[in-house]
C-alpha cells in the first residue's frame, strides 16, 4: 500500500482539493512569503501526481516584521516610501501602506529591534518618533484611520514619541 495516497484519501475521497498555507515569518531567518513558498514547493513535490490540488499561500504576521507585507499582499493596497527617524533618531528609508482609507504602519520597520545593534539598544533613549512621522505623512495624504502593529519595538515609551512627533 502507498501510505502517501492512503493519507490523502483519508482526508477527502478524491485527494486534497484546496490547501491553504498561512505561516508567520521565522524571525531572523525567513519572511512569511519565503516560509509559505518553501512549504508550497515541498507539497507540490510530494503531491506531484495530483494536479487537481490548489495551493493558496497567505502571508501572516503577529504585528511585527512582515505585517505591512501581509496586509498589502492580501488587500492590494499602496506602498508609500518616506524618510523617517528610527528609534535612535537616525534618518532611514521607511514605508507604510494605505489600504482604502486606512494607513497600515509596522513599528518594526521604523522603531524595531532589528534596526538597532544589540550594544546600541537602550530603552531610555529609544523613541517611536518615526512612527508619528509616518502617521503625519498619511494624514497629509487624507488618511484618517491608522492600524499600527506594535510587535518587536525597540521602545518602551508606549508611543509617546510618535504622539509628540504629530
Show which residues each predicted segment covers.
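N-terminal loops that bind phosphate or other acidic moieties
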Residues: 3-150, 154-166
Amino acid at each position: 500500500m502507498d501510505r502517501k495516497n492512503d493519507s490523502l484519501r483519508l482526508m477527502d475521497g478524491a485527494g486534497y482539493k484546496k490547501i491553504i498555507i498561512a505561516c508567520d515569518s521565522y524571525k531572523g531567518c525567513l519572511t512569511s512569503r519565503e516560509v509559505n513558498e518553501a512549504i508550497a514547493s515541498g507539497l507540490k513535490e510530494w503531491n506531484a501526481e495530483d494536479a487537481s490540488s490548489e495551493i493558496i499561500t497567505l502571508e501572516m504576521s503577529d504585528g511585527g516584521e512582515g505585517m505591512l507585507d501581509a496586509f498589502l499582499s492580501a488587500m492590494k493596497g499602496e506602498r508609500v516610501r518616506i524618510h523617517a527617524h528610527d528609534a535612535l533618531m537616525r534618518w532611514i528609508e521607511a514605508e507604510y501602506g494605505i489600504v482604502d482609507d486606512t494607513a497600515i504602519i509596522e513599528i518594526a520597520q521604523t522603531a524595531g529591534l532589528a534596526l538597532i545593534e544589540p550594544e546600541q539598544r537602550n530603552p531610555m533613549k529609544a523613541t517611536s518618533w518615526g512612527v508619528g512621522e509616518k502617521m503625519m505623512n498619511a494624514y497629509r495624504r487624507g488618511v484618517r484611520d491608522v492600524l499600527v502593529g506594535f510587535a518587536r519595538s525597540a521602545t518602551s515609551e508606549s508611543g509617546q514619541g510618535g504622539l509628540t512627533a504629530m
